Amino acid sequence: MVRYMVTSALPYANGPIHAGHLAGAYLPADIFVRYLRLKGEEVLFICGTDEHGTPITFRALKEGRSPREIVDEFHEHIKTTFERAKISFDFFGRTELPVHYRLSQEFFLKALENGHLVKKVTKQAYCEHDKMFLPDRYVIGTCPYCGAENQRGDQCEVCGHPLTPEILINPRCNICGNPITFKDSAHYYIRMQDFEERLKKWVESQEHWKPNVRNTVLGWINEGLEERAITRDLDWGIPVPLDDEDVKGKVLYVWFEAPIGYISITIEHLKREGKENEWKKFWLNLDGETKVIHFIGKDNIPFHAIFWPAFLMAYGKYRDEEVEAEWNLPYDIPANEYLNLEGKKFSTSRNWAIWVHEFLDVWPADYLRYYLTAIMPETRDSDFSFEDFKKKINEELVNNLGNFVHRAMTFVNRYFDGVVPERGELNDLDRQALEEIEKAFKETGELISNYRFKDALKRVMELAIFGNRYFDYQKPWKTAKENRERTATTVNVSLQIVKALGILLEPFLPDASEKIWHLLNLEEVKKWSFEELPAGHRVRKAFPMFRKVTDGEIIYFIVNYIGRGNPDSAKILLNKYYKQEDVVKVTLERFGEKRKDEALALLKSIYGDEFKGEKPEKAGKAEKKEKVKEGKKMEYVSFDEFAKLDLRVGKIIEVNDHPNADRLYVVKVDLGDEVRQLVAGLKKYYKPEELLGHYVVIIANLEPKKLRGVESQGMLLAADDGERVALLMPDKEVKLGARIR
């Protein structure tokens, strides 16, 4: 039986995780692993922080702290962020573990023993001002391949080509900014040319790889592989395990030892689980049944598809008292392209980024997972847009998925006391619905297996769309009056679709999946197969699964988070979407009176000289308040006139923005035997989530009228004192449609 060893690229422990990281290496892997678990496959999902190398020492130097303090802080921060984003690693380790030191030094010595390493004295970057050898990342200059400026000496962020300080144009120190020199220094190099032919044949045989990965790797190999240094002039890292004065005080290059972390972290995890030797079946080719799959971003393709396999080859066979075997080479490396932000590449140094931990302070993890999956850069770069984020969540997640689940759960509770009803005779649409469930499982599974996560999520959402159309076509609110059996069948089939969605969503939206499982009152373990909800099973009462993303939330996020890190970036984003007066108003409301000075200072830092300040109260507003206080002269109506009004109790089941008006909502109200669409001027006073699920009073026999192009089939009743608006709501639940007398 096939087993899976799944890894995500080890993040550097020198800073937080942004949405580009998540979309590239972590969310795709999590979707894949959750699917495998639902299928009952044997799978191990491993990751951990990369805690050596220049990114860590560079940050420590800038902040006047030790590298140990930096890695300890960010290991915990990154681990917590992944947990909040529902990334379900079996174990999240670190490369500061003793087992990693031991194994990395063992790999070095084995490669040396097998003749694949050579010691060379070469010119290394040196800063006369700081009196130190400079690691590649401490050197910046112009990329000789694409001409991009301010690129680090290890890899160009623009074209992705690996670099060395020697080939940079106009290289300078990234610490002090002065031009660098080059001094002699002894280092060990791996002879990559020893593996060129073997690597080429191996890559050519990987016909199941993504074309972008396979073509990139073959292009590299065809250019010819050269010796590359695997030791560095640093004092933080894994010491070179030799009694050699030439390399005394030097460490293993992080690009050599970091991927070994996949194995060392696996060993540590299984040792803690009391399965000390089980790591071998995942990493050694004992039976040909293990598939090692590395999820990475495209900048890591050469390191995982060329250098890492070469290190495994350089080690040779692993031998101990129990086994003798070759290492498992990667089975697949499904690298994603880049995620951009509003048309520009993510930049951590300029804070042009969506930091995951900050995003999750404002929105649920499922919102980020849904949007990143929907725009996942699987074969080409994609773009994170706040406007598109709002649109996709509100139209697809809330209006489609959430609406269907809520409708089905509401009807089973209203008409069948929360018990799944027996089905009657099936019509063609009923049968099609049940067939759609089976098709959704088959097709979604195939798409996930082929790393087409964007299409897989789309296929799941198509089932929710079908569910809504099925519900609309069957019209259970009408058949409930005349044909209970038909209504029972519609509700039963709808609940089967809801259960199917609860399983199908698990890889993508684990929290939504759990909410559906809770609504259906299920305790069974989810499996990637479908067993129908039995008639007679009791479910729970409906509640809204999602809330809409609002402009106020987006403004607050940009101001409070991006604005603090980089006011210029915040200004660009705010000016793209919003008027300054609206930004000021929302910010002051969100911060509140106690934090007003803080809010104004933040806005001033964002807008600079363009800041117009707090908008004064409109002239006449105070007069309006006074008029309300004075009140109008009472005018009487006859009882007969009042009796003409059909006032009824309803429940708000859906709230959408009006497509043509900024201050209006389009609200759907359930009256028991029908659902009415109303247009209401409540946007200034209520958020959508504050309206959903509430019982309200409407005028049901008001002549329908189009308001800004949308028909309103009644009117909500509310009190207005000139400053605040309050809906009229019954003080206890009554039957929907009950008349006000």
From Swiss-Prot:
Placement of sequence motif 'KMSKS' region: 345-349
Binding site for Zn(2+): 143, 146, 156, 159
UniProt keyword DNA damage present: no
Bound cofactor: record note: Binds 1 zinc ion per subunit.
GO molecular function: ATP binding; metal ion binding; methionine-tRNA ligase activity; tRNA binding
GO terms under cellular component: cytosol
Cofactor(s) required, per the database record: Zn(2+)
Sequence motif 'HIGH' region, residues: 11-21
CDD domains, A to Z: Anticodon_Ia_Met, MetRS_core, tRNA_bind_EcMetRS_like
Binding-site residues for ATP, renumbered to this chain: 348
PROSITE patterns for the chain: AA_TRNA_LIGASE_I, TRBD
Function: Is required not only for elongation of protein synthesis but also for the initiation of all mRNA translation through initiator tRNA(fMet) aminoacylation.
Annotated protein name in UniProt: Methionine--tRNA ligase
Organism: Thermococcus kodakarensis (strain ATCC BAA-918 / JCM 12380 / KOD1) (Pyrococcus kodakaraensis (strain KOD1))
